[in-house]
Amino acid sequence: ANHQKEVCQSLANKIISVAEIRKDAVAFVSPNRGSFLSDGSAGSVVVFDANQITDNVISFFAPVSSSSFAVFDSTYKYMYDRFADTFRYVPMNGDIAGLCARNDINNFPWFSPAGTARGAILNAVKLAYNPSQTQRDQLYSNRVNPIIFSPGGGIILFGDKTGLGKASAFDRINVRRLFIFLENAISGAARDQMFEFNDEITRTNFVNIVEPFLRD
C-alpha cells in the first residue's frame, strides 16, 4: 500500500525498536512507495528521475532511528506475481532478508550478503531505481545500501551497511549478525550452567565450552 511517508517512517522506527529490545533480530526496511512510484488505474509507474529519487530515499531514512539492528535498502523491484497473474513493484526488504538467510545456509552469518558472489537478487525483471556511481556514494554515506543492475552480474545488493549512524564495527551487516550468532550460542551454553555451584569447576567448564567455540 502507498502509505504516507511519515506513517512508513513511524512503522520503521517501531520495528527497529522491537529488534533493539530483542537483540536477536534485524529489521529490514525499504523506502516508502511514494519515493519512486505513482499507483493509478493503469498500474504503477516511476514518476521521478534518478536524482529526485536519490533525494527522496535519503530524505525518507534521515529521521529513521540509528541502529545496528536495522538494514536499509534503496529501491523496489518489478516482478511477476503468480498468485494474481500480474506484474507489480514490491519493496526489496524481503529480498535482503532472504539474502541473509541464504547466506546462513550456504556460508555463515559473518559473511557479507552483498556483492556478485552472495548478493544476487532473484525473480526481478527490473528495478524502479538503478543508482549511478555518484548516487550510490550518496546513498551509502546516508546508511542506505544501493541495489543495482550490473551488466553481466544481474541485480545485486551493492552495500553491507547497517542503519547505525556513526562509524563503528557494528555499521556492517556481517559484524552485527556475527555478534547475534555468538550471543545466542554463548547464552545457550550459559543456561546449561544455571544453578550449578559458582566455583572454579563450574567456571572452568564454561570457559572450556566457550573458548573452543570461539576459536573455531
Regions found by a protein language model. Name each.
Residues A1-D216:
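Structured, hydrophobic secondary-structure cores that serve as assembly/anchoring elements
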